Amino acid sequence: MSDNEDNFDGDDFDDVEEDEGLDDLENAEEEGQVNVEILPSGERPQANQKRITTPYMTKYERARVLGTRALQIAMCAPVMVELEGETDPLLIAMKELKARKIPIIIRRYLPDGSYEDWGVDELIITD
């Protein structure tokens, strides 16, 4: 038992000031301003009709995809390519990327708040 447990009476939280930012959120709901659109469970977001971003995978996207996939493989996720003695998760992720078998979707946000979703298999990968 520590010394702090003996002196705790539960009333120590009374002197904490309430956050005034919460009042703004409550007032926004009362004014009828809704910033969130909830889709029904059967309805999916609209697919990209015309994409305006480049079809090339950037070096930052490549690094993020390889790191994320290597972490998944290290945590025993199923591997999407045939292994030929590889044990390093990063090397396996690189092999999956080269074979375009990584099951990850890249979401690119645009300045107007919209976004484009690209599958790894849709992007052009340069080395």
UniProtKB/Swiss-Prot annotation:
InterPro entries per record: DNA-dir_RNA_polK_14-18kDa_CS, Pol_omega/Rpo6/RPB6, RPB6, RPB6/omega-like_sf, Rpo6/Rpb6
| Domain of life per record | Eukaryota
What Gene3D superfamilies does the database record attribute to this sequence? Answer: 3.90.940.10
| Molecular function (Gene Ontology), one example | DNA binding
Q: N-acetylserine: which positions carry it? A: S2
- Chain segments carrying region Disordered: 1-52
- One Pfam family cited in the UniProt record for this chain: RNA_pol_Rpb6
Q: Where in the cell is it found?
A: Nucleus; Nucleus, Nucleolus
Query: Which keywords does this Swiss-Prot/TrEMBL entry list?
Result: Acetylation, DNA-directed RNA polymerase, Nucleus, Phosphoprotein, Transcription
Q: Does the keyword Transmembrane helix apply?
A: no
SUPFAM superfamilies assigned: RPB6/omega subunit-like (SSF63562)
Per the UniProt entry, what is one GO biological process? Answer: transcription by RNA polymerase I
Q: Phosphoserine-modified residues are where? A: S2
Q: Name one GO cellular component term.
A: nucleus
Annotated Acidic residues bias: 1-32
Purpose of the protein = DNA-dependent RNA polymerase catalyzes the transcription of DNA into RNA using the four ribonucleoside triphosphates as substrates. Common component of RNA polymerases I, II, and III which synthesize ribosomal RNA precursors, mRNA precursors and many functional non-coding RNAs, and small RNAs, such as 5S rRNA and tRNAs, respectively. Pol II is the central component of the basal RNA polymerase II transcription machinery. Pols are composed of mobile elements that move relative to each other.
- Homology family: Belongs to the archaeal Rpo6/eukaryotic RPB6 RNA polymerase subunit family.
User: What is annotated about its quaternary structure and interactions?
Assistant: Component of the RNA polymerase I (Pol I), RNA polymerase II (Pol II) and RNA polymerase III (Pol III) complexes consisting of at least 13, 12 and 17 subunits, respectively. Pol I complex consists of a ten-subunit catalytic core composed of POLR1A/RPA1, POLR1B/RPA2, POLR1C/RPAC1, POLR1D/RPAC2, POLR1H/RPA12, POLR2E/RPABC1, POLR2F/RPABC2, POLR2H/RPABC3, POLR2K/RPABC4 and POLR2L/RPABC5; a mobile stalk subunit POLR1F/RPA43 protruding from the core and additional subunits homologous to general transcription factors POLR1E/RPA49 and POLR1G/RPA34.
Put simply, this protein is called: DNA-directed RNA polymerases I, II, and III subunit RPABC2
